Amino acid sequence: MGRTRVVIWFRNDLRLLDNACVARAATLASESSDVEVVPVYVFDETYFKPSKRGLARFGAGRGKFTLECVGDLKTSLRALGSDLLVRCGKSRDVIAELTLTGANDRTIILTQTEVTSEETEMDVAVERATRERARGGAASATMERHWGSTLYHIDDVPFDVTSGLSDLPDVFTPFRNKVESKCKVRDVIPAPTANELGHVPASVEGFEWMPKPSDLPFASSEIAMDCDKRIKDCLDERSVLDFKGGESNALARVKYYLWESDRLATYFETRNGMLGGDYSTKLAPWLALGCVSPRHVVSEIRRYESERVENKSTYWVIFELIWRDFFKFFALKHGNKIFHLDGTAGRRASWKRDEKILKAWKTGTTGYPLIDANMRELAATGFMSNRGRQNVASWLALDAGIDWRHGADWFEHHLLDYDTASNWGNWCAAAGMTGGRINRFNIAKQTKDYDPAGEYIKTWVKELAEVPAAYIADPNQAPRELRDRIGLNYPNKLALPRRDFTEMGSPPGPRRGGGGGGRGRGRPGGSTPNRGTKARVASVYDTVYG
Ligand SMILES: Cc1cc2nc3c(=O)[nH]c(=O)nc-3n(C[C@H](O)[C@H](O)[C@H](O)COP(=O)(O)OP(=O)(O)OC[C@H]3O[C@@H](n4cnc5c(N)ncnc54)[C@H](O)[C@@H]3O)c2cc1C
């Protein structure tokens, strides 16, 4: 009889609690003392390559956060008597190297099911490479994919998984109504206890190694240096939170937001804020890297509801987590269309390239204070409120008419909570490319409603510190005498094109190309053909949100 090695290939599931792969490894290890468990994480160079539009996809802030997540997982695994092997390179090569090759040996690779093409293509490459290596020595290698990133398990959702979720609604409300009425959230899977994963085998070397920023395959040495700097000292004092990666910090944040501060009980009223740590949960970065599962968050909310209070706020965090699920399943259904210029609806619109506008948007110098403040916050801290994201996305895509994928790329580079399905799904929707109505935000009115005194704007746009609230949405409209007195030095609003939204139609028949994907080419979830109809075009209208 040969040996059995179980490789836990951690990706966006950097936790021990409620992790189906970890639980499965513990079960396999309990079946025989000959089973050895090797937990591994790879900083895969694929994610660090520039996007199709030339922007480095993995930024310094996310580099720091991910290093912290991986370090925290390593510490937790060591506390159990196991460890985490950390590598940089290609997952395919690293995991193939871990494959046993002796006669009758078997290697079982456990990994979380992913929904987008780059990740699923990576699975296939790992599977192929490990099989080939095992076969060379008359051994065997298999991969098990375990679902784990959503609140509702894919096997429980009331949609046709076998047809690639072809009956999944393309808008949120019917999706939510169906999942809430038809399925239950499964129980949280307990974390393993000491020694359940056994000790890592002595034959595998390199467990003592943890990469530094300069070891990560960043697109440039400047990004690596910036990452190093962020680790060593410089938390911007205006950051909403000192985000530190890792499961222990994620669980501490859940505990704080629910039990220690009771902020959960007022979430509905505060969620549109932009300043401070507590207007929203700030769980997104940890959820994106899988340091905490949405199921754990919801089970804690349910406990809070039974022990403290149940109200609209406690429900609303669950509501938001269902949005997160929606975008995961939406990505699975539509495959690479979420990366295409004409989106999942196949809508044609006149997008343009304008380097001046794009640069102003990225650097927070558009002359629109709410946009500039949010964009500066993102670049400095890796975070932006949901209110801010809606506004800056609407401005870039719908007001400026810039190819919205440049915006999605920029977010991918900067956001600590970057999640492929949430980011590209939200951008595609914000650009009006998922079908249905188009929600264009009135930036001046949004400023008045959500930052009437300009407190948030002044935090990030220092040159507006002296501008009275009455002129905060458009400082250059202040009387000349006032502008001179305060020495206002802020750009005029960029001139933007007038856009005709009725032109956004969907072409009849299947997409004929020209949209140009943002990432890889695979189609993991399949897709439905575009049905460009007059009714659909007629349903497109410009809602200016107040
Ligand atoms: C253009 C654009 C891009 C976005 N990109 C991302 C992204 O890459 N990663 C990401 O996690 N969120 C993304 N969002 C969604 C949302 O803005 C963030 O999840 C939220 O602001 C994070 O703050 P929070 O954790 O305090 O959220 P809370 O308000 O506390 O909400 C709780 C959780 O619900 C989930 N959630 C809330 N709103 C959404 C939403 N619209 N879509 C998906 N999940 C949601 C998040 O996991 C969040 O942590 C994007 C939104 C827009 C408009």
UniProtKB/Swiss-Prot annotation:
May have a photoreceptor function. Binds ss- and ds-DNA in a sequence non-specific manner, lacks photolyase activity. This is Cryptochrome DASH, chloroplastic/mitochondrial. SUPFAM superfamilies: Cryptochrome/photolyase FAD-binding domain, Cryptochrome/photolyase, N-terminal domain. It comes from Ostreococcus tauri. One of its GO terms (cellular component) is chloroplast. PANTHER family: CRYPTOCHROME, CRYPTOCHROME DASH. Belongs to the DNA photolyase class-1 family. GO terms for molecular function: deoxyribodipyrimidine photo-lyase activity; DNA binding; FAD binding. Residues 511-525 have a biased composition (Gly residues). The keyword DNA-binding applies. Residues 4-151 form the Photolyase/cryptochrome alpha/beta domain. It holds the Pfam family DNA_photolyase. Keywords: Chloroplast, Chromophore, DNA-binding, FAD, Flavoprotein, Mitochondrion, Plastid, Transit peptide. Binds 1 FAD per subunit. Binds 1 5,10-methenyltetrahydrofolate (MTHF) per subunit.
